[in-house]
């Protein structure tokens, strides 16, 4: 058995010297040290040895096992080191070659305008509130004075997840959640993504950004609403910006209005963009409906408020004269590099 052990050691060491791949080294380990390996087989037969031979052969077998394990590890490290050196040589950088200029990214115009809008309102004392994009039907509709089967629901093509969950069609639900959590005075904006089941075209997208605002306190009037939004428009588009309000209808405000601004293309002269009117719709607004306040346990006899909402994508299009909303979602560097 001593001769067998010495022969196994000699054969294993000889095979290790000839191998050039890590996979071959592993096959040698399995051949000699694996569960069915040659050395393992001999160790299992030691019970047939005499008591005198057993400790001598056992020590020799363990020494050979240790020597083989060390040799296998050294061979594996040698091969890995050789492969690493070859790889490094193949990846050598020729410092005389001209460098490749990296394309520098730019802030997306949608992000720029959204940040500008938030900064304007924060400077006016508004806080920023956030809410879930997957919203309860109650917060998206019912709490906003739009009960089930109300005709106003037909104006918003809604993505329903089930009977009680929707992808929010507006950020107004955040106003309800804020009024439930906070007592007046409240002065907040809620920017974020909203979803409508619209076909994609130059002016419509199933996903777009919206910003809504809410002010609730004692003695709030339409004059406060008008002054706030006119100040926002001047800060956003310049002091020369002219605005006007015209009556409209929203279920969650009474009275309601839409604010128009002078056309950015023709400066109020009339063109194709403004359909010859000289004005472009900017946002919707109004005094918070008393029922909406009641739904949030706020007494409309004590408190009043105003709310407004605007599409951020629309603001970008107006500010930069973009005529197709799809340009903002196609990641075309030729378009983005213009801003």
Curated annotation (Swiss-Prot):
CDD domains the UniProt entry points to: PheRS_alpha_core
Gene3D superfamilies xref list: Bira Bifunctional Protein, Domain 2 (3.30.930.10)
Disulfide bond positions: none
Residues the record lists as binding Mg(2+): 254
Location(s), subcellular: Cytoplasm
Record's keyword annotation contains Ligase: yes
EC number from the UniProt entry: 6.1.1.20
Gene Ontology CC entries for this record: cytoplasm
Keyword Nuclease: no
Primary enzyme class: ligase
Keywords linked to the UniProt accession: Aminoacyl-tRNA synthetase, ATP-binding, Cytoplasm, Ligase, Magnesium, Metal-binding, Nucleotide-binding, Protein biosynthesis
Cofactor binding note from Swiss-Prot or TrEMBL: Binds 2 magnesium ions per tetramer.
An example Gene Ontology biological process: phenylalanyl-tRNA aminoacylation
Catalytic activity: tRNA(Phe) + L-phenylalanine + ATP = L-phenylalanyl-tRNA(Phe) + AMP + diphosphate + H(+)
Family the entry assigns: Belongs to the class-II aminoacyl-tRNA synthetase family. Phe-tRNA synthetase alpha subunit type 1 subfamily.
Record text on subunit structure and interactions: Tetramer of two alpha and two beta subunits.
The name this protein goes by in its record: Phenylalanine--tRNA ligase alpha subunit
Species annotation: Clostridium kluyveri (strain ATCC 8527 / DSM 555 / NBRC 12016 / NCIMB 10680 / K1)
